[in-house]
Regions:
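Bacterial Sec-dependent N-terminal signal peptides
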Residues: 1-25
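Sec-dependent signal peptide cleavage junction
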Residues: 18-45
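Ankyrin-repeat boundary/"N-cap" motif
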Residues: 21-31, 52-65, 87-97, 121-133, ...
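Ankyrin repeat A-helix N-terminal signature
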Residues: 33-35, 63-70, 98-104, 131-139, ...
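Ankyrin repeat domain, specifically the short helix-to-loop turn at the C-terminus of the second helix
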Residues: 41-49, 75-84, 109-117, 144-153, ...
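Long, mid-chain structured domain cores
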Residues: 90-134, 138-150, 164
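Solenoidal tandem-repeat scaffolds enriched in leucines and small polar residues
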Residues: 136-257, 262-265, 270-273
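Eukaryotic tandem repeat interaction scaffolds
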Residues: 238-386
Length: 386
């Protein structure tokens, strides 16, 4: 009976989400065609609401911005009823966040001229300018628009980093560095943890850039290895990058940050990392290392979509039933993220099916949480492609 009820609920939820997606303006494929204002008006005339959002709070204007729609089309959408420069979208971001993220200088200037708040922070505490910088945007013209609107060029953001440090990873030829140096920033800037420009540049895995920084006297820190492991939003670094940092720059392969994380904490849920994982296993990096929240690389790997890394970790696991500060085990991670293969691997290793978290929740609760209606899976893996 319970099973039938759950299936019925899942079916109803799927139908609901499907119904929500009938608005053609919410179809990502529509925006791949660079539609004109006239094309959008035609769809609106058919009854498609230009202010609607999908299940992940990406509204139509956000989709248009993230798919680099024509400026006139985006401007038209911003001015439609239900849309505004203060409208909150995914992660409580306003349109200025997305315009800056895409490096759309014309749109940034337009939104600022309409009164968009250059200091507005999303749910992660990120403002439009640092959101852009940390996602690879380094064009001076766009930052000029922010500075002219009153944004302090030397403002400190997350962990005491400035825009220059965030943008450095994408500044292959250090051209933006010259620009930011005229705004009170320099290659000698560090964040609150002493991370240098070298560490921030390591995120890109650009060895040529890293060598340029060394030539300029910028010292590396152990955290550079962890920055490299984090990579960028859509790209991961190569084995060559890690070998350069460990074997030439002489950063310890077992380096940890202040949160107690090693490279495995960042690599364990990324795809196509098998050779890199094997390299660091050979260097003695600990798969059982718990960070300050009690999370281990094994737990993170158990929650990944692929099981290749988990399989590499399992022979080195000391206690498969280790729990983090919330009382979650590797099996909890696997169940919550809906990975039957990972669950089977952990059970074969002796994982306890009766595990409960600190709130007394058993695996059944996490199984319910693992349910994702059809149509939401893609957005949950890479929402910016929505």
């Amino acid at each position: 009976m319970k099973k039938n009820l759950f299936v019925s609920f899942a079916f109803a939820a799927t139908l609901f989400v499907s119904a929500q997606q009938k608005n053609t303006l919410l179809d990502a494929a529509f925006w791949k065609t660079s539609p004109t204002v006239e094309t959008v008006q035609t769809e609106i005339a058919k009854g498609n609401n230009p202010a609607e959002a999908n299940a992940n709070a990406f509204d139509i204007t956000t989709l248009a911005i993230n798919n680099d729609a024509p400026f006139a089309t985006i401007k038209f959408l911003v001015e439609q009823p239900g849309n505004s420069i203060t409208k909150l979208t995914h992660d409580n971001r306003i349109y200025l966040h997305w315009a800056a993220y895409r490096g759309n200088t014309d749109l940034v200037q337009y939104l600022i001229a309409k009164g968009s708040d250059v200091n507005f922070e999303d749910s992660h505490g990120t403002a439009p300018a640092d959101f852009a910088a940390s996602n690879g945007q380094s064009a001076p013209a766009m930052y000029d628009a922010f500075f002219k609107a009153g944004l302090n060029p030397t403002k400190k953001y997350a962990n005491g980093a400035n825009l220059f440090l965030f943008a450095l990873a994408s500044d292959k030829h250090l051209k933006a560095t010259d620009y930011f140096s005229t705004k009170g920033m320099s290659l000698k800037d560090v964040d609150n943890d002493g991370n240098t420009a070298f560490s921030y540049a390591a995120r890109s895995g650009n060895i040529a850039l890293l060598k340029k920084l060394l030539e300029k006297g910028i010292k590396p820190t152990d955290n550079a290895l962890l920055f490299a492991a984090q990579g960028s939003r859509r790209e991961t670094n190569t084995l060559e990058t890690y070998k350069y940092l460990v074997e030439e720059v002489k950063i310890k392969a077992t380096a940890q940050n202040k949160a107690g994380q090693n490279v495995f904490h960042f690599l364990a849920n990324k795809p196509n990392q098998t050779e890199i994982i094997k390299y660091f296993l050979g260097k003695g990096v600990d798969v059982n290392k718990a960070d300050k929240e009690g999370n281990t690389p094994v737990m993170i790997a158990a929650g990944a979509r692929e099981t290749a890394i988990l399989e590499l970790f399992l022979p080195s696991v000391k206690n498969i039933n280790t729990q983090n500060l919330k009382g979650e085990s590797a099996l909890t991670f696997a169940v919550r993220n809906g990975s039957p293969d990972a669950v089977n691997l952990l059970l074969a290793k002796g994982a306890d099916v009766n595990v409960k978290d600190k709130d007394g929740n058993n695996l059944g609760v996490y199984l319910v949480q693992s349910y994702r209606p059809a149509g939401r899976e893609k957005a949950s893996t890479d929402p910016f492609d929505a």
